[in-house]
């Protein structure tokens, strides 16, 4: 027995001394360089979880009277498309109207009713770690539940398992302009969201009143980036209790436990050394560059365009990629639902400038599967939509553009209007960039597809 105890103590000593120097019985001095290396891994790992929670806190911070927000387990239905005055989210989508809801399925499943529609309408179900747990793309009645929930569902209700108690649902409904909004409103009115215990007796169900807290009015990413190490990691540790990490994370979590990062733990900031504040600030300042460099391998090339490919939206152990996408595009779709190629240069590699006039030439239109669609949207250097006299922010497959006789398509990108504005996409005075959004893309056909080319028009 004594030999067994000695062996166990020896093993524990080796385990805990991995990030400590001078590991003696009397005193352990932290090896701060090793601690900070592990800390950086922990931050990248937990960043999407903490940012998602901050976004939820802001989005549900309402007593029910604030546009653009809704209490937990209730819909926030957008009522119009973004325009040049919109400044809430960068590079806003002007193809679909959103109906979002933040769900808490810890106590019981939530029932989501998706009506029949005559158009693209799907619901992305994300877990607390920003992975897409499911996509609801057919009309039906769904029960969003934790995997270990053991109750019975009524007939006709389809179970959808999500591994975390906190769930973000994003419904996207395509429309053809403002004149089409009444049809979208009709779809929104038929959507339902309620606890399973209230399903079938909706007339007795009273929607809970939300609550507004002034301190929770913040910009989520700024809130997270302003946290101290203790605030950040203790928030993450608490969130992991209701939103457990995936089994595939076990190896990393064993490593992170040495600095007290894990479900239910209390972070020990005494390990960080005397210059902790300075090193923390330096780490955060270099975060975007670190994430971008480490995630570059996931960027897919499409001519002069680039987009982020697999495993976006279903990240597995690609922790750095997951953190980068959370930072620049929280709630990204998987590639089978949509891809978002971007370019800021013409065919020569020169930066796009509004002082010039360009032709965006499609040899053929973007390949999509049944129900798919596409759009080209212009954004200014500030990543927002560009103000223009005809209030046109994109050209899409629903637009009244004119094809060439050979079936190709030429769009005009310019600051000033051409004589024929049918194919004109207005741009800004200075620099600008484009997003080519392809929804329900045909990924096999995409490999052989010739992407559009941007050519500067030469003055004659």
Residue spans for each PLM region:
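Bacterial N-terminal signal peptides that target proteins for export
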Residues: 1-8
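Intrinsic disorder/low-complexity segments
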Residues: 7, 17-21, 449
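A compositional/structural signature for long, glycine/proline-rich flexible linkers
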Residues: 26-460
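Bacterial Sec-dependent signal peptides at the C-terminal "C-region" and cleavage site
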Residues: 12-29
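A periodicity- and composition-biased signal for non-globular, repetitive helical segments
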Residues: 8-9, 443
């Amino acid at each position: 027995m004594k030999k067994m105890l000695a062996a166990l103590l020896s093993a524990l000593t080796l385990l805990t001394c991995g990030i400590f120097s001078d590991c003696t019985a009397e005193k352990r001095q932290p090896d701060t360089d090793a601690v900070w290396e592990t800390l950086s891994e922990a931050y990248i790992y937990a960043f999407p979880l903490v940012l998602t929670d901050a976004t939820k806190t802001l989005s549900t911070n309402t007593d029910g009277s604030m546009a653009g927000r809704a209490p937990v387990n209730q819909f926030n239905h957008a009522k119009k498309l973004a325009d040049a005055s919109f400044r809430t989210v960068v590079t806003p989508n002007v193809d679909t109207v959103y109906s979002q809801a933040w769900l808490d399925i810890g106590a019981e499943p939530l029932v989501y009713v998706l009506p029949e529609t005559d158009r693209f309408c799907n619901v992305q179900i994300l877990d607390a770690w920003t992975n897409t747990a499911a996509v609801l793309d057919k009309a039906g009645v769904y029960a969003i539940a934790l995997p270990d929930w053991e109750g019975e569902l009524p007939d006709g209700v389809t179970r959808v398992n999500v591994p975390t108690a906190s769930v973000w649902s994003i419904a996207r409904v395509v429309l053809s302009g403002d004149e089409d909004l009444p049809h979208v409103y009709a779809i929104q009115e038929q959507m339902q969201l309620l606890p399973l215990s209230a399903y079938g007796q909706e007339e007795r169900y009273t929607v809970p009143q939300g609550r507004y807290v002034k301190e929770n009015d913040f910009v989520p990413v700024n809130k997270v980036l302003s946290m101290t190490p203790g605030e950040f990691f203790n928030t993450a540790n608490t969130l992991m209790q209701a939103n457990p990490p995936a089994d595939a994370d076990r190896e990393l979590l064993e490593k992170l436990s040495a600095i007290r990062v894990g479900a239910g733990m209390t972070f020990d900031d005494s390990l960080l050394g005397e210059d902790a504040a300075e090193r923390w600030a330096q780490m955060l300042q270099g975060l975007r560059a670190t994430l971008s460099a480490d995630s570059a391998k996931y960027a897919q090339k499409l001519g002069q365009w680039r987009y982020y490919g697999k495993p976006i939206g279903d990240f597995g152990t690609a922790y750095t990629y997951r953190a980068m996408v959370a930072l620049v595009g929280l709630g990204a779709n998987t590639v089978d639902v949509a891809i978002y190629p971007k370019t800021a240069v013409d065919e020569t590699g020169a930066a796009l400038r509004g002082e010039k006039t360009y032709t965006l030439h499609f040899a053929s239109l973007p390949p999509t599967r049944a129900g798919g669609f596409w759009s080209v949207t212009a954004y200014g250097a500030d990543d927002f939509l560009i103000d223009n006299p005809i209030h046109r922010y994109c050209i899409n497959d629903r637009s009244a553009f004119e094809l060439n006789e050979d079936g190709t398509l030429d769009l005009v990108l310019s600051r000033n209007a051409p004589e024929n504005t049918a194919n004109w996409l207005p741009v800004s005075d200075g620099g600008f960039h484009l997003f080519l959004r392809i929804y329900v893309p045909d990924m096999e056909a995409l490999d052989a597809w010739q992407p559009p080319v941007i050519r500067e028009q030469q003055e004659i």
